[in-house]
């Protein structure tokens, strides 16, 4: 993910200008990295170090989603629908 794509995601999912810390932005950025790494692992099946990193990112995203669901269920439903996550 290059800098331009990262700024685009922050702008799309941020609650205000320059918002990088909200759960929505963090979830969207992690989803982008997860999707990228998933493609890498389809080609490089024996890259177990990257697979561990992927599993850690998925766990981190799961924690952020659980936090958002506890805090504001509508924001949670919106981000899950926008990103097309299975829940």
Curated annotation (Swiss-Prot):
UniProt entry tagged with the keyword Cytoplasm: no
Subunit structure: Part of the 30S ribosomal subunit. Forms a bridge to the 50S subunit in the 70S ribosome, contacting the 23S rRNA.
Annotated SUPFAM superfamilies: S15/NS1 RNA-binding domain
Family according to the record: Belongs to the universal ribosomal protein uS15 family.
Single GO biological process annotation from the record: translation
HAMAP family noted in UniProt: Ribosomal_uS15_B (MF_01343_B)
Listed name of the protein: Small ribosomal subunit protein uS15
């Amino acid at each position: 993910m290059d800098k331009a794509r990262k700024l685009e995601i922050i702008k799309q999912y941020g609650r205000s200008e320059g918002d990088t810390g909200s759960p929505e932005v963090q979830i969207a950025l992690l989803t982008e990295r997860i999707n990228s790494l998933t493609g890498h692992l389809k080609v490089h099946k024996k890259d177990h170090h990257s697979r561990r990193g992927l599993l850690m990112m998925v766990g981190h995203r799961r924690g952020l989603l659980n936090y958002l669901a506890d805090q504001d269920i509508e924001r949670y439903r919106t981000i899950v629908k926008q990103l097309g996550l299975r829940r």
